[in-house]
Amino acid sequence: MLPIRKVLGSTDFSIAGHPAVLAAGELAGHFGAELVLLHVVQPAPTTPLVPPERMVVLPSGSETEKYERDEENRSLEELNRLVVERLPKGLSCRTLVRVGSAAEEIVRLSESEEVDLIVIATHGRTGWRHLAFGSVAEKVVRTATRPVLVVQSPSQVPQDSKQ
């Protein structure tokens, strides 16, 4: 059996993501493993996303850095609250926040931390939403060199399979 000493759980703080956080905590507790809980902050936009005639002023470098720092601090507080309120007491857990592409940061951290398992949620987007936004879970599964457990929220499981 694969030894599990360190589990990486990631969250975007959505309702659909909570089951993955809980699963990561349960697995870490079951195996006596450390849980590394990660949230990735999207970087502030630095290029216009609208036509020039509708352009708004984008933040300068120092404003961008301040925005990202504020988001990191807010996210770290939210992660710590999640650990206290939702995860088993006595669990060995570290919380981390990174800025960047969610999939890339999850994979990068899984390597640098030498985790034994990545636990991630899927939001179940289909159609144009999947095409427009992509799937962080899908990108992680394709690019990670570590095992990945993808957790669906209960609302995503087809009704005929809930028996």
Question: What residues fall within each predicted segment?
Answer:
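Structural beta-alpha unit
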Residues: 1-2, 30, 42-44, 73, ...
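Small/aliphatic-rich secondary-structure junction motif
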Residues: 2-61, 154-156
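Short, well-ordered secondary-structure micro-motifs
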Residues: 20, 47-50, 107-108, 131-132, ...
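General small-molecule cofactor/ligand-binding pocket signal
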Residues: 36-38, 94-98, 149
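Short, hinge-like loop/turn segments at secondary-structure boundaries
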Residues: 52-56, 112-113, 136-137
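A short acidic, glycine-rich active-site loop
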Residues: 57-75
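Glycine-rich, Arg-bearing micro-motifs that act as flexible, cationic patches
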Residues: 117-139, 157-160
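Short, flexible loop segments at boundaries between secondary-structure elements
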Residues: 146-154
